[in-house]
Structure formats: structure tokens, C-alpha cells
């Protein structure tokens, strides 16, 4: 005899910890909660130190798996080179062993693009300690490393559009440069939708034309979408991520204890 419908229980969803590594802070959230915690980042932050501080900051949180947004190039879910704005020791670090949880890694701009994507072509640009971007074209996320690309004859995107550039050049000039950069990127990529995020998105007023502002809380949505059972599922393919907009709902979510086993 089958179990009566009234007594059947839906699969228990996995709890996903988001670790979003920025140049100034590492943002932490867990799925199902709106609380965000932060730990300091910067040029002294090693992978080992990050893990230690994340463990301390999340000691009272329950989670089964981890999504890690990394400020640099990621290929097939693995780090390709050391980050520009952090200390070293990241490339060969075993995050799964250190956390004793399954870990999936994604470029940080791609994480937020995944969170905000709806359809068609979408451009995400993040302005903060650094400058990051990702284009989503027909459900394929393509990170764009903008930082060292020339912005003018003597400047790069990094030297004109970061938090430090705003401090040195003043808000008005910085905002003018941001508008010019966004217009340039829109002319190059022809997005249907442009999303502005990063730590400095909140001080852009008004926004550039044809843009919307991302919320700081959006990242957890992208973190969840790296794991089976989400409303959308993104899987790495080289240096891109392919989004399944309609993942099968019939496949049950694996129990957390099974996913937490690390080979």
C-alpha cells in the first residue's frame, strides 16, 4: 500500500552556503535566510585564512553544500590563476577537504549574473574594489575580465571605475566614467537587459540608461542555482556556465547527508 498523499513529505531541500569573495569583504549567506554576514577581505587574505574565518563566522549556521564566488578566472569549476586583489595560495587549495562539504566554484560576476538572468541577452557589470562583468547569451554565462582592458588612452577599466578611483577622482567624475563604460559595453554586447551590481551600485543615482540595480541579497539565488533541485541549474562548461532553465522537477533532491560526503 502506498503512503497516503496527506502523509507524504516533500524532499528536504539542501541548505546552500554562499561565499562571495570580494576585494573588500567576503559576503556570507545561507539559503532560506536573509541575513548576510561579512568578513574582511583584501591583499592579506589567503585561502586558508578565508576558510578559517568563514568557519568561525558561520559556526551557528547549518548548511549542506557550498557555492563559492571567486574574483577571477574559473574553468570547469576550478581556479585557473591567483586573484589580483587577494594574497596567494588559492590555486591548489582543496576547499572541499577544508570545509568537509561539497563545494562548487563560479566566477563572482557569473554568480550574480546567474542570480539575475531571466531570458535573452543580459549584461551584468559589478563596480566595487574591482570591476567585473558577465554576459549571459541564450542561457550561457560568459564572464568578461574587464579590469586591465584599456578604457582610455592612459587608463584601464580598473584605474577609472573602482572604489579607489571614486575616492581619488571624486564621485561626479567616477559616475561619468561609469556611464561611459556601461554605454560602451552595451554597444559591444547589445544586451536586452543590463544589471548593475557590486558594492558601489548603491551610490549610482541615477542609473545609466536601460539598466536596473542588483540587490546585495541576489547572490544567494545564484548560489542555489549551482545545485540540483533549484528552479534553474547552471553547470560549468570550460570558462562558461550553461543554464538549464527548466530542470527536471521529477528527480528528487538527494538527501543532504549523501551530498555532504566528500570523496
What kind of feature is each model-predicted range?
Residues 2-52, 140-168:
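Short glycine-rich, Thr/Ser-proximal phosphate-binding strand/loop in the N-terminal lobe
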